[in-house]
A protein has these predicted regions:
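Conserved catalytic cores of very large enzyme subunits
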Residues: 2-318, 468-556, 577, 581-735
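Metallocofactor- and cofactor-centric catalytic cores in central/energy metabolism, strongly enriched
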Residues: 189-192, 573, 758-761
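A short structural micro-motif
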Residues: 201, 742-745
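Residue-level marker of positions within ordered structural domains that often coincide
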Residues: 223, 403, 450-452, 503, ...
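Autoprocessing domains of the Hint superfamily
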Residues: 319-468, 644-728, 733, 737-739, ...
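Core of folded catalytic or high-affinity ligand/protein-binding domains
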Residues: 555-556, 560-563, 753-754
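Contiguous, well-ordered alpha-helical segments that form the cores/surfaces of helical PPI scaffolds
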Residues: 560-573, 593, 738
Length: 773
């Protein structure tokens, strides 16, 4: 008989046998199946077989940290909430304490290559070295996180190298002859070959990701969004990024069209694309971009659109031009004066690097100028007879006793952090007045404190203010919008999700009791997330997170995320019709407002919470299974990932947009993606009208999904959902669509997700009829 020390591993041995017998990798996984694993082999098995041990190790280390920070009772509650499935911790199978996802800035790569991530490659000097180095960057960065990596600057940096090699007007002469590896090629050939090199390389299996492709996201920008995000940014040789806008616009269009056509040759999953579109509340500011987006949807391309009425997700915390600043320039000269005047002085020197005070510490920063926006007057009582009034942008963040609060959300009586020079301590001073300003400015000004420093600086009065993050996404509703919706150097450190359906049913449908229970559970979740954050900070201090050390990601700009799942199912349990109605609106608002208020109350300097309607590719299935096993009401085998029931034919296209609009998501500060499944593509004009409708409703993040058809016999791919191959006549077909956030073959999905796909309602005819009328 085999000794017990070996026999106790029998479950692992059985798992290996079972895994090899299953049809596909997603169906074989016991822990976190996902359709991004396109093949099943010993490499994917090696990744799967150790996951149970990593989960237990993760829970043990979290228990230890929680016990040290909050006591044994809190630590025990963590294990209990996980094991009773009230709470789910995403990617527990990863190496603790890896961060969850990141939208990286590529500037350190431009300066130092991959040396900051432990590589040997120098900074890229040519287009080809950029392309090769970029692929390695994506793999190296992805190895440091549990989930997705976004590189919003990818095309802007590629454009820079194209300009260096072929001139600023290269986009006007794409058919001009050029050389690539000694071959005569056109400039356009070089560009599309580079696209192919990067895209096909990144879609290969990665050893550090369990032999699956990395989750890679990129961004496109309209002109005002781009200028708002990159105003003042210069490449190392002094080239101003915004001066290259027209060539970048051409390159963005070229990539989208190339990628759309390439997907007729292969079903390519990554990158997940997001087009950032600025609106004025009624329409797109950049009409060229609006029409291009609509045309690409009509041509069958699959991408997300993110629309906002400001670039506040990407820049924040600015002051009026006459605000008094005190700084030291690079010559160690103390400069005191109005922000606009100081900026002009630095502009003459062409050096915006400065130093600024934070208490008694001097910290490095960069002086920044950004386009003007809505302003507010904030009056702070420094002393009994000393009041200071500041004119700041509406999204300016003030560190208060209740966390970092935007100017437009400050209220009389809030207390703002202040440096007391006499006693040499930090204290707080009350806000006495908050007034919306009627002033308009071409530009507003602030300082961006260097990565690695606390994100604050001090005004001459002693008031502490949050610094400007030129490439930030601090406040608006963003899909892990921290990822791929425009934000740079951001992301999420950890995501833990509440099962709303279970919580409501455990309270017997009593919503007063459910609200109190949700508030209490969210408070616990915050302590769990803070414990994980402490582990991340400890790892950072020991230089275990090179993404932080090298400046690719700013830890102070990463969220601790509270996820939700089972919202639709909870409403159904309560007998509330899931749709655009008063009862459902009040229910969703109660849930999201409760979490949002707790997020605000528990925030503190260096700790930001947000709430996300998580995609839940595997969690939607798990929660349904766990709840059903415990005798709870479970209406479907996979919980929804949207504010509507995905199979409901009564929910129109316009309903879906409204259900993901301001009326429902105003307190969902971490984002949700509205997936609109269509039977067939619409016209460009119809898509344009839908985008305008999304702007009107405040639906900020959305995409349209029409299944692609793949012939399993001849390999032909169509952008349409067909019943027979138009090339060979075969009915042996596969389909490709978004399982949640990314495009894959349905045949690669888990059995439960395949069943969920079969139930999806692919509508759109009702909208076509409305549009025609």
């Amino acid at each position: 008989m085999i000794p017990d020390k070996y026999a106790r591993y029998r479950p692992e041995a059985n798992f290996i046998k079972r895994y090899m017998d299953e049809k596909c990798a997603a169906e074989s996984s016991d822990y976190d199946p996902n359709s991004n694993v396109s093949s099943k082999n010993l490499a994917t098995l090696a990744s799967e077989s150790g996951k149970r041990g990593r989960i237990y190790t993760s829970r043990l280390m979290m228990h230890d940290m929680l016990a040290a920070m909050y006591g044994e009772e809190e630590a025990d509650s963590y294990i209990n909430n996980l094991e009773t499935h009230r709470v789910y911790c995403h990617d527990e199978t990863g190496q603790i304490p890896q961060i969850y996802c990141a939208s990286i800035t590529m500037y350190p790569f431009l300066l130092h290559g991959l040396k900051g991530l432990g590589g040997t490659s120098d900074a890229p000097k040519t287009l080809q070295s950029f392309a090769g180095g970029f692929v390695n960057l994506v793999f190296a960065a992805s190895a440091q996180v549990l989930g997705a990596i976004a590189t919003p600057e990818f095309l802007a940096y590629m454009n820079y190298f194209l300009v260096k090699e072929y001139g600023e007007d290269y986009y006007l002469k794409p058919d001009t002859q050029a050389e690539l590896f000694g071959r005569k090629r056109t400039i356009d050939n070089v560009i599309t070959d580079t696209f192919a090199q990067v895209v096909y390389s990144v879609n290969q299996p990665a050893a550090a990701r369990g032999n699956q492709a990395v989750f890679w996201n990129i961004s496109y920008f309209d002109e005002p969004y781009f200028r708002g995000l990159f105003e003042g940014f210069a490449f190392p040789d002094g080239t101003v990024m915004t001066d290259l806008w027209e060539s970048l616009w051409w390159l963005q269009v070229r990539f989208m069209k190339w990628f759309n056509q390439e997907r007729l040759r292969k079903i390519i999953t990554f990158p997940v694309e997001t087009f950032s579109l600025l609106n004025d509340g009624k329409t797109a500011v950049d009409q060229r971009a609006l029409k291009h987006i609509a045309e690409m949807y009509a041509e069958g391309h699959s991408f997300f659109t993110y629309t906002s009425d400001s670039v506040d997700s990407l820049s924040s915390c600015c002051f009026a031009p006459d605000t008094l600043f005190s700084i030291w320039d690079q010559h160690n000269t103390l400069l005191v004066g109005a922000a606009a005047r100081l900026y002009q002085m630095l502009e003459q020197e062409q050096d915006f690097r400065v130093r600024v005070l934070l208490g008694e510490e001097v910290v490095p920063a960069t002086f920044i100028r950004l386009p003007g926006r809505q302003m507010y007057f904030i009056t702070i009582d420094i002393a009994p007879n000393a009041r200071h009034m500041y004119e700041v942008t509406d999204n300016h963040l003030f560190p208060t006793r209740r966390g970092d609060i935007q100017a437009k959300e400050l209220v009389e009586g809030d207390e703002v952090q202040y440096w007391d020079p006499e006693n040499r301590v930090y204290s707080y001073r009350p806000v006495s007045e908050v007034i919306e300003s009627a002033n308009t400015y071409d530009y507003v000004y602030c300082l961006e404190v260097d990565a690695g420093c606390e994100p604050y600086f001090m005004l001459p009065s002693g008031v502490i203010t949050h610094n400007c993050r030129l490439k930030n996404n601090i406040v608006e509703n963003q899909f892990t919008y921290s990822l791929g919706a425009g934000g740079i150097a951001t992301g999420s450190k950890r995501v833990m999700t509440i099962n709303i359906n279970r919580l409501v049913q455990e309270c017997g449908g009593d919503m007063a009791k459910a609200k109190a229970s949700l508030d209490d559970l969210t408070a616990h979740l915050h302590r769990y997330l803070k414990a994980y954050n402490a582990m991340v900070k400890d790892a950072q201090a020991k230089h275990m997170i090179p993404l932080y050390d090298a400046g690719f990601v700013s830890p102070e700009k990463q969220y601790l995320t509270v996820g939700i799942n089972g919202l639709v199912e909870a409403a159904e349990y309560l007998g509330i019709p899931v749709g655009d109605n008063k009862g459902y609106s009040e229910f969703t608002d109660l849930i999201l407002d409760t979490i949002h208020r707790r997020n605000v109350a528990d925030a503190e300097p260096g700790v930001m919470f947000n709430t996300e309607y998580v995609p839940a590719e595997s969690l939607g299935v798990k929660n349904a299974k766990w709840d059903k096993a415990d005798g709870l009401s479970v209406p479907r085998a996979c919980y929804n990932s949207y504010f509507f029931a995905v199979e409901d034919p009564r929910t129109t296209v316009l309903d879906k947009i409204r259900l993901h609009g301001n009326r429902y998501i105003r307190n969902l500060d971490g984002g949700s993606a509205c997936h609109i499944n269509l039977e067939e593509h619409l016209t460009a004009r119809q898509y344009e009208l839908l985008i305008l409708n999304a702007i009107h409703e405040g639906c900020s993040y959305f995409t349209f999904n029409v299944p692609n058809t793949i012939c399993s016999d001849c390999g032909h791919i169509s952008k349409h959902k067909l019943e027979k191959c138009p090339k060979c006549g075969s009915e042996n077909l596969d389909y490709a669509t978004r399982i949640i956030g990314y495009l894959t073959r349905v045949s690669k999905w888990s059995a439960e997700r395949k069943n969920e796909y079969d139930r999806r309602y692919f509508g759109g005819q009702e909208y076509e009829d409305q549009a025609e009328s």
